[in-house]
Curated annotation (Swiss-Prot):
Keywords: Allosteric enzyme, ATP-binding, Carbohydrate metabolism, Glycogen biosynthesis, Glycogen metabolism, Nucleotide-binding, Nucleotidyltransferase, Transferase. This is Glucose-1-phosphate adenylyltransferase. The gene is glgC. It comes from Cronobacter sakazakii (strain ATCC BAA-894) (Enterobacter sakazakii). Belongs to the bacterial/plant glucose-1-phosphate adenylyltransferase family. GO terms for molecular function: ATP binding; glucose-1-phosphate adenylyltransferase activity.
């Protein structure tokens, strides 16, 4: 591929996204979220009071100037597809802008679905080639972060890389869940191990390991060549982290891109924000952090908005019930269509159309859309799934044994409540 001559960074920031296509891998099940992903893919899980997890990757693309996007789906895709069709249909076909939905179709390899993340792209190569992009940006659809991909594209081009991997230091104890890399003084990746049992630490800090974020930029022709070779390799697991990136590393073609260089944040002195909300505790904690006085993730940055499907809902309402009890909230996010009647909500996140009846106390809870809470309930350190009806007088989050018997209780004490669990109680 012909390299661009050295140009002004602002010019490159405008040009490179137009030469790129983003592919969002959104077919993951998210098994560590337990029953929260029983009926939806992890990227379709609600987050932050009104969003879905995939909205962050999609918004990053739009804000970075990338308006050619493919979303690769597989597991429980209906909710995700519906959300994208309703909330992300504003692209201009005349301007060659689009969000293409690329579901698993069992088009090759007999009856198999996608065999891995790399195979998910391989099975759609005929479509992807038609985009005629010079650069392909591979993204995971299940992380919470704000990143300017145009800055990473500039880094990719200026280094003369054929593959660039976004990376971030993480505690060694957490690095087992990531691909871990080593780099030289020129940011070339010299070693890469996917999810090692004993992650190697960084030379400059033995408490941290340099982790891959699952965000890659490839020269398009180089990526197609790699995927075609991988497809013919019967011993491959057809995964970017396990197969493609190690191969690129050992051929000397991979470079690292430090996430702080392209992370978008209001406070330049703050730690770069990136979360894998793949466990119930991580999901619960990341939601509640948004309700704090100074959240780590700034959702109010008008220069980098997070977009989503906007429903026509009335404002949230806090009312006094007939007994004189006031509906009150503190340090919480309360979305449109919610009604809090004579109850107290503290340090919680309420998604649209939640109804909390009188004499309730809700503390450190995440209530997904359409939850109905009966009178005199107490909810603490819990996640209530969509459309659950909490019976009058129910107490959740105060008795560990009772919570574990009736619902799912994590080792950290976070209680997940779903409609099926409630139905079993009344059976």
């Amino acid at each position: 591929m012909v390299r661009l001559e050295k140009k002004d960074p602002l010019m490159l920031a405008r040009q490179l996204p137009l030469k790129s296509v983003a592919l969002i891998l959104a077919g993951g099940r998210g098994t560590r979220l337990k029953d929260l992903t029983a009926t939806r893919a992890k990227p379709a899980v609600h987050f932050g009071g009104k969003f879905r997890i995939i909205d962050f990757a999609l918004s990053n693309c739009i804000n970075s100037g990338i308006r050619r996007i493919g979303v690769i789906t597989q597991y429980q895709s209906h909710t995700l597809v519906q959300h994208i069709q309703r909330g992300w249909s504003f692209f201009s076909e005349e301007m060659n802008e689009f969000v293409d939905l690329l579901p698993a179709q069992q088009r090759v390899h007999g009856e198999t679905w996608y065999r891995g993340t790399a195979d998910a792209v391989t099975q759609n190569l005929d479509i992807i080639r038609r985009y005629k992009a010079e650069y392909v940006v591979i993204l995971a659809g299940d992380h919470i972060y704000k990143q300017d991909y145009s800055r990473m594209l500039i880094d990719h081009v200026e280094k003369g890389a054929r593959c660039t991997v976004a990376c971030l230091p993480v505690p060694v104890a957490e690095a087992r869940a990531f691909g871990v890399m080593a780099v030289d003084e020129n940011s070339k990746v010299i070693d890469f191990v996917e999810k090692p049992a004993n992650p190697p630490s960084m030379p400059c800090d033995d408490t941290k390991a340099l982790a891959s974020m699952g965000i890659y930029i490839f020269d398009a022709d180089y990526l197609y060549e790699l995927l075609e070779e991988d497809d013919e390799n019967e011993s491959s697991s057809h995964d970017f982290g396990k197969d493609i990136i190690p191969k690129v590393t050992y051929s000397g073609e991979a470079y690292a891109h430090p996430f702080p260089l392209s992370c978008v944040q209001s406070d330049p002195n703050a730690e770069p924000y990136w979360r894998d909300v793949g466990t119930l505790e991580a999901y619960w904690k990341a939601n509640l952090d948004l309700a704090s006085v100074t959240p780590e993730l700034d959702m109010y940055d008008q220069d980098w908005p997070i977009r989503t499907h906007m429903e026509s809902l009335p404002p949230a309402k806090f009312v006094q019930d007939r007994s004189g009890s006031h509906g009150m909230t503190l340090n919480s996010l309360v979305s449109g269509g919610c009604i809090i009647s004579g109850s107290v909500v503290v340090q919680s996140v309420l998604f649209p159309r939640v109804r909390v009846n009188s004499f309730c106390n809700i503390d450190s809870a995440v209530l997904l859309p359409d939850v109905w809470v009966g009178r005199s309930c107490r909810l603490r350190r819990c996640i209530i799934d969509r459309a659950c009806v909490i019976p009058e007088g129910m107490v959740i989050g105060e008795n560990a044994e009772e919570d574990a018997r009736r619902f799912y209780r994590s080792e950290e004490g976070i209680v997940l409540v779903t409609r099926d669990m409630l139905a079993r109680l009344s059976a």
